[in-house]
């Protein structure tokens, strides 16, 4: 899985990967 896919699907990612989803949300909050 690419990080791009994870950032594009923040809706279900946190459900499958709580740890990764949380990290992604933090990255999205930063704007990158």
Curated annotation (Swiss-Prot):
Q: Which positions are linked by Cyclopeptide (Gly-Pro)? A: 11-18
Cystine pairs annotated here are none
| Entry keyword set | Toxin
Q: Which domain of life is it from?
A: Eukaryota
User: What job does this protein perform?
Assistant: Probable toxin that belongs to the MSDIN-like toxin family responsible for a large number of food poisoning cases and deaths.
Please give the family membership noted in the entry.
Belongs to the MSDIN fungal toxin family.
This protein is called what? Answer: MSDIN-like toxin proprotein 1
Question: Origin organism of this chain?
Answer: Amanita bisporigera
Species lineage = Eukaryota, Fungi, Dikarya, Basidiomycota, Agaricomycotina
Q: Which gene encodes it?
A: MSD1
């Amino acid at each position: 899985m690419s990080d791009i896919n994870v950032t594009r699907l923040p809706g279900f990612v946190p459900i499958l990967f709580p740890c990764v989803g949380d990290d992604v949300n933090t990255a999205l909050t930063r704007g990158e």
